[in-house]
UniProtKB/Swiss-Prot annotation:
It comes from Saccharomyces cerevisiae (strain ATCC 204508 / S288c). This is Nucleolar complex-associated protein 3. Present with 11700 molecules/cell in log phase SD medium. Required for synthesis of 60S ribosomal subunits and the transport of pre-ribosomes from the nucleoplasm to the cytoplasm. Also required for initiation of DNA replication. May function downstream of the origin recognition complex (ORC complex) in the loading of CDC6 and the minichromosome maintenance complex (MCM complex) onto chromatin during the G1 phase of the cell cycle. Essential for growth. The modification Phosphoserine is found at residue 395.
Amino acid sequence: MAKRNRSQFRIQERTAKKRKHEDSLLEGNVFQNAPEDMDENTIYSAKGSSWDEEEQDYEMVPRKNRSDTSNLVEGLPIKVNGKVERKLHKAQEKPKDDDEEDEDSNDSSEDDEGPNEEQEAEAKEDEPDTEEKILQLKEDIADLVTKVMEEPEENTAALGRLCKMVESKNPNTCKFSMLALVPVFKSIIPGYRIRPLTETEKKEKVSKEVSKLRNFEQALVYNYKNYVGRLQSLSKTPSNAAPIQVSLGILATQAAKELISTASHFNFRTDIFTLLLRRICKPRISTDPTSIQIIQTFETLLNEDEEGSISFEILRIFNKILKTRNFNIEESVLNMLLSLDVLHDYDPNTKLKGNVSAPKLKKKDRVHLSKKQRKARKEMQQIEEEMRNAEQAVSAEERERNQSEILKIVFTIYLNILKNNAKTLIGSVLEGLTKFGNMANFDLLGDFLEVMKELISDTEFDNLSSAEVRKALLCIVSAFSLISNTQYMKVNVDLSKFVDGLYALLPYICLDADIELSYRSLRLADPLNNEIIKPSVNVSTKAELLLKALDHVFFRSKSGTKERATAFTKRLYMCISHTPEKTSIAILKFIDKLMNRYPEISGLYSSEDRIGNGHFIMEADNPSRSNPEAATLWDNALLEKHYCPVVTKGLRSLSSRSKECSK
């Protein structure tokens, strides 16, 4: 009983001391200054409790479990003294991901949220792409392309996202999306130009389908414009830039080439034409792998254009670029003009005949229409005009206008090249003048003839190469082709310079080994030749050009005389001894035709009953100075033993005809 009372007394005493101590702490604000993380042991130590009642530090430390294998990884077991022992080693801790650290930093700083997101996007673009990322990128692009191809009007957002990906700084994203958009645009581009809506059309009420179609057309034009602009910026990459940028520029050029082959009628075709023409209008295009394909694309467009609008647009841009580049381009680029097919049925003389306007009807002969009827007729005419514009139906007058403008630009380009004396392009210019010369305008005739006379005068007839012989022949044929268009006008032009040049060329033509060969001839290409060879559209051989020039001199112009016919016959007989079989036969047929027009040349076959002063000067390059009346065709006796029986037969026929003419 006494023990129980003592224990109760002690408990009460201890409780009283505890309360007193807590009251003193409250009065001294000790709890307010105490740290928040103060545990219960610290509080009891502050009370002054006895050491026996407090828990010691080592009692609070958890016991070590030696068998804890949470951080251990079991390796391969080993066998020691016949016993198998387990081998454990510590597992390597994985470092924290950068993404988690970025998320923590983003959560801590909400104010810098916008700039951090942009930096993260740029950092992601700068990161090298792994195979997994590239595969995922291809799958995403394929999904977007599938959506647009299946329902283009419903998925304009997917089209916009693809166009946005082209502007990415990541080269893989830019490349894959740019190439993927080519078949997309080729399939969804309509067969007509899309014009902007007028203010009246925007305000008027339309059906759901029309509104849906208009929204799709406007979205298509907007995205297509951005895409073409991106192609333009990429294609301007210089060749000394980074290899990745150069490859992107080549891919952009190829994409533009593919687009324009099917979308030449659509909006922004001028931008694509400019992009491609700037790419090939260079002094050396052999370094550009896309140049040959671009030239072939333009040739196809010029050859298939029947209306003339595409050809006119291409030539207008081409002329402008040529002036800025000072005509410093390759010949294969200029040869594109020879593919123009829209001029094949153009006759500039019909314009003069068709300009006669129909006589106006007198007032008494007109059909009387009321004011209401006139208004209705005017509205109907406007509707018909809008329908024609929508259908892009080109009338005969518009086509003829396009042909006239195209021909004007072509001759302007050729004349400027001749005036600037661009030697590498003269051959192509003469090819073009030979093809289009008969359509030349009378105003340009004098300029062309003056330039061509200078070319013939500057030609040194001492030692000419095969290419120089062809250029001189083309110059002569072109000059006569230009004059042939003026037959309906009374124009007298002195062409003696070209006749003398043709006479001087004959010895070099007959000694040319390739006189009957063109680029179509069956010959193996030189494997060591790396140049881009664009054969001319005018595939005439030198023999054909020679016969064409002779025909112009004696049968299509007033340049032929008895004296010139005699001199040319003598020199042509000298050429037959060296020319191949087919050329020799063709020359004999020409002489037979010439004898019908100028029977005086029959005197060359015999020296009987003929009075001649002096002797024939064989070395003279001017027919009037060679004294042709004193010439004799002693070559006939030599050529009678020619290896070709057809040539021998032709010579005998001419000899017998000469005897009939001299009687």
